[in-house]
From Swiss-Prot:
Gene3D superfamilies in UniProt: 1.10.287.210, Human immunodeficiency virus 1, Gp160, envelope glycoprotein
Motif Di-leucine internalization motif mapped to chain: 856-857
Signal peptide as annotated in the record: 1-22
Name this polypeptide is given: Envelope glycoprotein gp160
Chain intervals for the UniProt region annotation (V3): 297-330
Positions of region (Fusion peptide): 504-524
Gene behind the chain: env
Segments for region (V5): 454-461
Length: 857
């Protein structure tokens, strides 16, 4: 019996635990969590030149950053922000420096003569004494520095149909010798074609444009955010950056395009650091600003460019030579380059990815091998719309102090046909503009590949222009805020949930929304009452900022790709917010910050640590469960709506006014009419059946005729009976006048039939009740016995529990009494001992005095 009772108690306790310890899915809206995004960004700039303002929005410098106590993965090469920067700078570059279409007709044979045999790219061995230039060197101003010869050019003539289409006309044009392909005849006159004639297909007209260095920043669309790794040890790839800040916009970035070096960058600091690709040897090295590294480029000369008309609508630019330096240019480098390059080597040795020699004497700067594209072999840069190709051989000799001619300047030449740096192909540009061209830049970075072999390390300059923008923006990443989260709680929908404390949140737009990203889940959930409003306020704020700059910039109406992308960012966040609200509505949680549900949390192995885990960490663990949880919530909401509909139908009669609503009654009136019609039809069928059965037995129908019917009705003979003397003829009239009319009797008959019908129905119902009552009585008796058994069991269980509680109470009382007595006894003993010790100490002087007295006696 005792074991049985113990088993019952255990079952009850287990059931109670299952009921009260169950975990239910709770929907939180407004959590500080995010995921990687690839939505297009929009740009903002302070430049006011024509193409800059068309391509980007005006910059208002109203941007903030807040630190987040989280860790996040960053990769400068696998990055949406840097990929967009590369693509967008290419589009800006193509927009500002347009390829020219007027050269397409020159895919014809030309007769060319060389006009100069000197080359600026001279590789002949000269003096090994370094020739170093500075701002005061005289050859800079008069263009007389050594090793700077004239460019090799060819003067070509070709025939084309001009204004008169039936008569060919001869034209003249001067080319840089490397822009044409000629035969190998030994004579002074050669047959030549334009280089890349068959691959350069251009379909738009162009004018001569140029661009200066332009800076712009990227801004996240409303509802999204930019994260930045603020760790000084970040080197382009970091799985767990410990210092993360949130921002709405990036810093300003430079749009200079060049190979080998990066110019005027915004990431240069008073130190040297290296961004290293996570999987190969590609690097971008940021140079120390302390060494003040600069590059000054110059194209001397004063050359006129005169247009000639080939035919109507086609104008070609002729280039008659005025001086002896056509297309000639050169660049000299200022600053302490040798110390800067030595610091680069020392920084490379300390880099965690470096596995080569630690001896900086065996680390050398090298240029790419011959045979590559000109943009790889030479340092390629853009100077006011002109493309310079500079031979850096003697400059590298000077840096590495090699036993070869050393110069801190490099001869350059200008080309019209260049290889595109972002896509495969060639572009043809207009001839150099007239007059002298001067460009001054600050060298801020080096694009290089690190090659380690045979205890030697080569820092090979690279032509990966895109690496410049990975250095500029590689510490950023774009994330999409995911404000909806799921977590298990013990609260069930419609249960009495405890009141949540509200905590004020400072308003920083979307950045304020992420302010608690590093807090524990329990602390962050306390601010959810303010987060959705803050989230929406941040979206509205960003939308308003974007709308304001669009209104300030009327040139936006003329945009193509960039403008469309900028305008599309205005609807991105609204769509996301409405999509989130639609999801919440499908779960029955619309416009709620914390929404309890009736869906059980089935993954008991995945439980959040509310005191130590952030929402971002929790979301990463439960992201795979989101689809199943969402589907379960939708099914629960559908069932809840069905239940509510049925309950509303039952509760509609609780309102007294609904009883007078005809629409509520008409349905039941229809049911009543159907019942009456059914009873009447059934009665008619029964009567017809009975009538047919009587006819078969020989009875005459009751309603065969009125006279027959009257004959079957009892007639009172004492009413106006005729005299016996009357004749037979008068009998009929006397009968008709002295009898009851047959319709009245028929009504009496119907009344009797109706009474009989009702009596029959009453008998049937009474019989049905009499037969059902014993069955119901048995059911009620069984139910009564079951309730009695449950009552007795509950009484017994309660008695056991009371007995157990009384026993436990007695044990506790005995324990308390024993403890109290023990402590009291111990205290008395301790107090007595302390008293004896104290009296002994107080008696010491008396004992001393007594001893002294005895000694004196």
């Amino acid at each position: 019996m005792d074991s049985r009772n113990q088993l019952i108690v255990a079952i009850l306790l287990t059931s109670a635990c299952l009921i009260y310890c169950a975990q239910y899915v709770t929907v939180f809206y407004g959590i500080p969590a995010w995921k990687n995004a690839s939505i297009p960004l929009f740009c903002a700039t302070r430049n006011r030149d024509t193409w800059g303002t068309i391509q980007c929005l005006p910059d208002n410098d109203d941007y903030q950053e807040i630190p987040l106590n989280v860790t996040e993965a960053f990769d400068a090469w696998n990055n949406t922000v840097t990929e967009q920067a590369v693509e967008d700078v290419w589009n800006l570059f193509e927009t500002s420096v347009k390829p020219c279409v007027k050269l397409t007709p020159l895919c014809v044979q030309m007769e060319c003569n060389s006009t100069s045999t000197e080359s600026s790219n001279s590789t002949s061995e000269g003096s090994t004494v370094p020739e170093i230039l500075n701002e005061t060197t005289s050859c800079i101003t008069n263009n007389s520095c050594s090793d700077l010869g004239s460019e090799e050019v060819v003067d070509c003539r070709f025939n084309m149909t001009g204004l008169q289409l039936d008569k060919p006309q001869q034209y003249s044009e001067t080319w840089y010798s490397k822009d044409v392909v000629c035969d190998t005849t030994n004579g002074t006159s050669r047959k030549c074609y334009m280089n890349h004639c068959n691959t350069s297909v251009i379909t738009e007209s162009c004018d001569k444009h140029y661009w200066d260095a332009m800076r712009f920043r990227y801004c996240a669309p409303p509802g999204l955010c930019l994260l930045r790794c603020n760790d000084t040890n970040y080197s382009g790839f970091e799985p767990k950056c410990p210092k993360v800040v949130a921002a709405t916009c990036t810093r300003m970035m430079e749009t200079q395009t060049s190979t080998w070096f990066g110019f005027n960058g915004t990431r240069a600091e008073n130190r040297t650091y290296i961004y290293w690709h996570g999987r190969d040897n590609r690097t971008i090295i940021s140079l120390n600003t302390h060494y003040n590294l600069t590059m000054h480029c110059k194209r001397p000369g004063n050359k006129s460019v005169l247009p000639i008309t080939l035919r109507s609508g086609r104008v070609f630019h002729s280039r008659p030579i005025i001086n002896e330096r056509p297309k000639q240019a050169w660049c000299w480098f200022g600053g302490d380059w040798k110390k800067a390059m030595q610091e680069v080597k020392q920084t490379l040795v300390k880099h965690p990815r470096y596995r080569g020699t630690n001896d900086t004497q065996k680390i050398n700067f090298t240029q790419p091998g011959k045979g590559s594209d000109a943009e790889v072999v030479y340092m390629w840069t853009n100077c006011r719309g002109e493309f310079l190709y500079c031979n850096m051989t003697r400059f590298l000799n000077w840096i590495e102090n090699r036993a070869h001619p050393q110069r801190n300047y490099a001869p350059c030449h200008i080309r019209q046909i260049i290889n595109t740096w972002h896509r495969v192909g060639q572009n043809i540009y207009l001839p150099p503009r007239e007059g002298e061209l001067v460009c001054n830049s600050t060298v801020t970075s080096i694009i290089a590949n690190i090659d380690m072999f045979d205890n030697q390390t080569s820092i090979t300059f690279s032509a990966e222009v895109a690496e410049l923008y990975r250095l500029e923006l590689g510490d950023y990443k774009l994330v999409e805020i995911t404000p909806i989260g799921f977590a298990p709680t013990s609260e069930k929908r419609y249960s009495s949930a405890p009141q949540r404390n509200k905590r004020g949140v400072f308003v920083l737009g979307v950045l304020g929304f992420l302010a608690t990203a590093g807090s524990a889940m329990g602390a962050a959930s306390l601010t959810l009452s303010a987060h959705p409003g803050l989230y929406w306020a941040g979206i509205v704020q960003q939308q308003q900022q974007l709308l304001d700059v669009v209104k300030r910039q009327q040139e936006m109406l003329r945009l193509t790709v960039w403008g469309t992308k900028n305008l599309q960012t205005r609807v991105t966040a609204i769509e996301k917010y409405l999509r989130d609200q639609a999801r919440l509505n499908s779960w029955g949680c619309a416009f709620r910050q914390v929404c309890y549900t009736t869906v059980l949390w089935e993954n008991n192995s995945i439980v959040p640590d509310w005191n130590n885990m952030t929402w971002q960490e929790w979301e990463q663990q439960t992201r795979d469960l989101e689809a199943n949880i969402s589907r379960s919530l939708e099914q629960a909401q559908i069932q809840q709506e069905k239940n509510m509909y049925e309950l509303q139908k039952l509760n509609s009669w609780d309102v007294f006014g609904n009883w007078f609503d005809l629409t509520s009654w008409i349905k039941y009136i229809q049911y009543g009419v159907y019942v009456i019609i059914g009873i009447i039809a059934l009665r008619i069928v029964i009567y017809v059946v009975q009538l047919l059965s009587r006819l078969r037995k020989g009875y005459r129908p009751v309603f065969s005729s009125p006279p027959g019917y009257i004959q079957q009705i009892h007639i009172h003979k004492d009413w106006e009976q005729p005299d016996r003397e009357e004749t037979d003829e008068d009998a009929g009239n006397s009968i008709g006048d002295s009898s009851w009319p047959w319709p009245i009797a028929y009504i009496h008959f119907l009344i009797r039939q109706l009474i009989r019908l009702l009596t029959g129905l009453y008998s049937v119902c009474k019989d049905l009740l009499s037969r059902s009552f014993p069955t119901l009585q048995l059911i009620f008796q069984s139910l009564q016995r079951a309730l009695t058994t449950i009552r007795d069991w509950l009484r017994l269980t309660i008695a056991y529990l009371q007995y157990g509680c009384e026993w436990i109470q007695e044990v506790l009382q005995v324990l308390a009494r024993t403890t109290r007595e023990t402590l009291a006894s111990a205290w008395r003993d301790l107090w007595g001992a302390m008293g004896r010790i104290g009296r002994g100490i107080l008696a010491v002087p008396r004992r001393i005095r007594q001893g002294a007295e005895l000694a004196l006696l």
